[in-house]
């Protein structure tokens, strides 16, 4: 979406989820619960604090808000983007670190309401048994899923790793496409208007998946309902 909202890193980088939806202009707010855990989703029991959108990362990152000491529910950013205009909302969650982590539990609780899951890892290594265990459980809750391997510009061997990961997914009976992407190549392509570099970044393939297999399917199901 061409907006550096969510922190990235090689370890668990964020401690709070970030919701990204459509808006007339870029804006952001922090959402706190004023009630019990059971009342957390009630808008009447929430406090919303506007912040500059460029500061979202400060409040959701593990380094400045370790294990969510600030007790945020989530950060909510709004952007004027065509991808989001049809109602698509993206949610960036903290790294799951296996089924037994608190982050995994929080992600699992949100999956039944999600239209799709993007499982993101970098292109340096094949999936661990903990990650495959997480995916096996996650796809029971949200069958519309895809895998995304990032930083492919840093790992010349990423395609071999991708094939190994496709094999792991198939062996586990997980039917989901896998995409390789590079945000750095995407940024360079946008800056130079280089169509070939944009294609190499892999981002367009992921956007097409979101438009067709997520937004398109959701609209079709809504029309049938």
Residue spans for each PLM region:
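Globular "head" domains of long coiled-coil molecular machines
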Residues: 1-222
């Amino acid at each position: 979406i061409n907006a550096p909202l969510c922190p990235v890193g090689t370890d668990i980088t964020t401690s709070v989820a970030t919701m990204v939806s459509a808006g007339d202009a870029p804006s952001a707010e922090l959402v706190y619960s004023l009630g019990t855990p059971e009342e957390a989703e009630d808008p009447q029991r929430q406090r919303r604090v506007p912040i500059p959108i460029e500061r979202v990362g400060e409040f959701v990152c593990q380094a400045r808000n370790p294990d969510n000491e600030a007790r945020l529910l989530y950060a909510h950013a709004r952007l004027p983007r065509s991808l989001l205009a049809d109602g698509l909302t993206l949610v960036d969650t903290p790294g799951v670190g296996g089924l037994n982590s608190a982050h995994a539990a929080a992600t699992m609780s949100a999956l039944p309401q999600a239209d799709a899951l993007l499982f993101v890892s970098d292109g340096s290594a094949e999936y661990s048994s903990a990650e495959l265990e997480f995916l096996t459980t996650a796809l029971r809750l949200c069958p519309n899923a895809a895998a995304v391997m990032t930083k492919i510009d840093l790992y010349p061997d990423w395609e071999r790793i991708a094939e190994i990961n496709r094999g792991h997914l198939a062996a586990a009976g997980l039917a989901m496409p896998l995409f390789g992407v590079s945000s750095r190549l995407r940024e360079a392509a946008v800056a130079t208007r280089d169509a070939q570099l944009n294609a190499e970044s892999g981002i367009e393939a992921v956007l097409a998946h979101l438009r067709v297999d997520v937004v398109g399917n959701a609209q079709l199901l809504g029309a049938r309902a």
